[in-house]
Swiss-Prot record:
Name recorded for this polypeptide: Urease accessory protein UreG
Highest rank taxon of the organism: Bacteria
GO cellular component labels: cytoplasm
Binding positions (GTP): 10-17
Entry keywords, A to Z: Chaperone, Cytoplasm, GTP-binding, Nickel insertion, Nucleotide-binding
InterPro entries xref list: CobW/HypB/UreG_nucleotide-bd, P-loop_NTPase, UreG
Subunit description: Homodimer. UreD, UreF and UreG form a complex that acts as a GTP-hydrolysis-dependent molecular chaperone, activating the urease apoprotein by helping to assemble the nickel containing metallocenter of UreC. The UreE protein probably delivers the nickel.
Single GO biological process annotation from the record: urea catabolic process
Protein family according to the UniProt entry: Belongs to the SIMIBI class G3E GTPase family. UreG subfamily.
Length: 202
């Protein structure tokens, strides 16, 4: 059985790497995991995951995209496809391969040739108007994660407004509020992966 490839996209600083770090630590005892990260000029996100102990270093790979990060996950995903193939050849028993895009704007989306499903991460610190601005990530991602809910009072963001606008933009598509610093909401993401991506029951 082929591993499921899960893309994780979102603006710079929204919490993409934090989400993968938390997911890896929550799921690694039950599933065989690997991660590929994208950065424009560095391997910073991959190095963070190695330092945090999310997974063994050989299960984490970094891709330097250069230029525009969304090109590397949609229009010209060759470098990522090569990294995916190398990881799959190295670990024949993978259950899940996470692929993190470089930080981008609200227009980013993954090529269906690169991932099976994708998660889009935004954060409350960017303001409560973000969901209503829409875009492929907010409207079309398989799961929307609204992170850093603890910052809402500090930045004057109204979570009720964000919830209303998210429901309007996404319809029946799932979404979740999280505070990845404390792990709040993480269980909902894990459960979504188990039920809706891996098609597992209780």
């Amino acid at each position: 059985m082929k591993p499921v490839k899960i893309g994780v996209a979102g603006p710079v600083g929204s919490g993409k790497t934090a989400l993968i770090d938390r997911l890896a630590k929550a799921m690694r005892d039950r599933y065989n995991l690997a991660v590929i990260t994208n950065d424009v000029y560095t391997y910073e996100d991959a190095e963070f995951l190695v330092r945090s102990g999310a997974l063994p270093p050989e299960r984490i790979a970094g891709v330097r995209t250069g230029g525009c990060p969304h090109t590397a996950i949609r229009e010209d995903p060759a470098a990522n496809q090569e990294a995916v193939e190398a990881m799959l050849a190295r670990f024949l028993d993978l259950d899940i391969l996470f692929l993190e895009s470089g930080g981008d704007n609200l227009a980013a989306s993954f090529s269906p040739e690169l991932v099976d499903v994708w998660i889009y991460v935004i954060d409350v610190a960017a303001g409560d108007k973000i969901p209503r601005k829409g875009g492929p990530g907010i409207e079309k991602s398989h799961l929307l994660v609204i992170n850093k809910i603890d910052l809402a009072p500090l930045v004057g963001a109204d979570l009720g407004v964000m919830e209303r606008d998210t429901r309007l933009k996404r319809g029946s598509r799932p979404w979740v509020f999280t505070n990845l610093k404390t792990g709040e909401g993480l269980d909902s993401v894990v459960e979504w992966i188990r039920r809706e991506v891996l098609f597992e029951g209780d």
